[in-house]
């Protein structure tokens, strides 16, 4: 085990000098002897000096402090022992419940599965959320992005997905909190505890207040734990909240390492960093990883390089819209902007496909008529268009749904709607079977039968 000494500290970047014949390799983990702080090697500068990123606060570090090379990359505990626990980027527990007991530790830097190992699947994953199951269905082993600006409900949607999948499908999930609010992480833990699904979730947090090194690597820590479960032959869910902060941490590290910035100030290695992470999130012949990633959209601009780079890797994109949230419709999913590769009659069946396209057709027509309504009023529309508008407004309200995880705020019990009921309900609305009901009957209900029941009390 070679030993070196600190020669320079600039924020989270620490330069360490080693004897020339014992220079550590890129990604090796070094440990500052006095305080147990882990450093990860990023660059070899020559003359035995390596440039590292600190995986913790570098406050109080001094030059010439002794540093040891562990000779291996950062490794984290994997396996059953991680379930129900909150860990940091190094796999150390932060929930005050003793050490994480596992038989194995895996390096966080791993190669993506080869072509031969990968498998493509077409099986659908039912989420119980109407708008998602109908218009942007998830594939088992697919990647889903939840796009939205600040405060439109990315985290709440994600928590509902975890709750539904854990309760209804009883699968294992890994949640990586990357650069998000500590308060949300805390709420999330208690939410999981209260709904008795904590023993099926591993939680890995590197929150907003952590140094950039932690936020850059914590997604890899969570992914490594998910890969272990996948290689055991399980179907795992990997939740990342928020993938944008992973990019942002990369930008901070890149600037500290002195790289030249590219478009909008992002790191020049943006596409490569994103690809390294995303290519590992895949299904093999032994098991699958289905990932749901929240993507913060800076200033609601989807063409920003960070969300634009993420788009390329996803199978389904769920776009949350501020305009829909303003109408009080939650989940605020934009039904015309959200897409999925699975929305294909060969995968989901002809009936589901026709209903989904029918719903989008009605909403699209309503969008076109809005200008005419704004200028001339409803009375100038033809009878057919009036009917379209009335159905569109019903559909719009029917796309809302009370969430289990939001019961505390809304006072309404959550609803899980099966895919069969979802398709049947929307088909009935498009076919005009419920034209006689007032539109407010469709707001915040589960199935269309519940809407009919609600109408009796209006």
From Swiss-Prot:
This enzyme's EC code(s): 7.1.2.2
Catalytic activity: ATP + H2O + 4 H(+)(in) = ADP + phosphate + 5 H(+)(out)
GO cellular component, one term: proton-transporting ATP synthase complex
EC top class named in words: translocase
Keywords: ATP synthesis, ATP-binding, Cell inner membrane, Cell membrane, CF(1), Hydrogen ion transport, Ion transport, Membrane, Nucleotide-binding, Translocase, Transport
Subunit structure: F-type ATPases have 2 components, CF(1) - the catalytic core - and CF(0) - the membrane proton channel. CF(1) has five subunits: alpha(3), beta(3), gamma(1), delta(1), epsilon(1). CF(0) has three main subunits: a(1), b(2) and c(9-12). The alpha and beta chains form an alternating ring which encloses part of the gamma chain. CF(1) is attached to CF(0) by a central stalk formed by the gamma and epsilon chains, while a peripheral stalk is formed by the delta and b chains.
Protein name, entry field: ATP synthase subunit beta
Organism: Halorhodospira halophila (strain DSM 244 / SL1)
Organism classification: Bacteria, Pseudomonadati, Pseudomonadota, Gammaproteobacteria, Chromatiales
Gene it is expressed from: atpD
